[in-house]
Amino acid sequence: MNTDPDIADAFKKMDLTGARRHVFLCVGPNCCATEAGLATWDVLKARLKEMNLPALRTKAACFRICRGGPWLVVYPEAVWYGGVTPERCERIVREHIVGGRPVEEWIAQTHPLL
């Protein structure tokens, strides 16, 4: 196990013990304009922080779909959403991440890993 104190501090700040979901967002440039992806990222980041939600977030450059983005994936359910605008992101945060109910009309795929 790594004993570097800076790495240990980084993990402590992430508070992995409290996380209930991990949200990944592809911000382009192949599936969408980078500006569109980053606008959605800004909303996701702000809402999770404002609401103090027990969720991790990760910004990604490519999910290898390369069309129909920005793409957002919510784990542990492994629900894939395509075309996630800032407005759609708001609803996904409210209904899926907070309420536990995936937004059915925007689901492109589900693929639980376990």
Label each residue range with its predicted role.
Residues 1-25, 29-31, 49-52, 78, ...:
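Iron-sulfur (Fe-S) cluster-binding modules
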Residues 41-55:
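Conserved helix-turn-beta segment immediately C-terminal to the redox Cys motif
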Residues 20-35, 58-77:
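Local cysteine-cluster metal-coordination motifs and their immediate loop/turn environment
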